[in-house]
Amino acid sequence: MRLNTLSPAEGSKKAGKRLGRGIGSGLGKTGGRGHKGQKSRSGGGVRRGFEGGQMPLYRRLPKFGFTSRKAAITAEVRLSDLAKVEGGVVDLNTLKATNIIGIQIEFAKVILAGEVTTPVTVRGLRVTKGARAAIEAAGGKIEE
């Protein structure tokens, strides 16, 4: 076997439809679009969700909920990320300095994900119960 003798398995590569290439191809002239009508035209077709003039589903259903603006400026910090902070003191500014959270973040919460091995001091961040227990078990402390 050589590289120049390799070929794909029989039937695995299906040729694409060649539209408008004569009557004998079966896809000549109208190219499978039929005669006249909106869908036969170039650029023809209806927009997504259009139901022929009937009141569409997205307008029949009621509006609900909202997008919290606070969610965009809030971040979750994993326990395993705390080890990346130099100096052992973790607060909002040190997290931003080490690129663990973005500069636009104003609130952060430490969650129980991963492990913390070195003792760290968490200052001014919210901490879940499980994360609090893990930090204290590793010899760290939480300052409000």
UniProtKB/Swiss-Prot annotation:
InterPro entries: Ribosomal_uL15 (IPR030878), Ribosomal_uL15/eL18 (IPR021131), Ribosomal_uL15/eL18_sf (IPR036227), Ribosomal_uL15_bac-type (IPR005749), Ribosomal_uL15_CS (IPR001196). Belongs to the universal ribosomal protein uL15 family. GO terms for cellular component: cytosolic large ribosomal subunit. Residues 1-54 are annotated as: Disordered. GO terms for biological process: translation. It comes from Salmonella arizonae (strain ATCC BAA-731 / CDC346-86 / RSK2980). Pfam families: Ribosomal_L27A. This is Large ribosomal subunit protein uL15. Binds to the 23S rRNA. Residues 21-31 have a biased composition (Gly residues). The gene is rplO. Part of the 50S ribosomal subunit. Gene3D superfamilies: 3.100.10.10. GO terms for molecular function: rRNA binding; structural constituent of ribosome. SUPFAM superfamilies: Ribosomal proteins L15p and L18e (SSF52080).
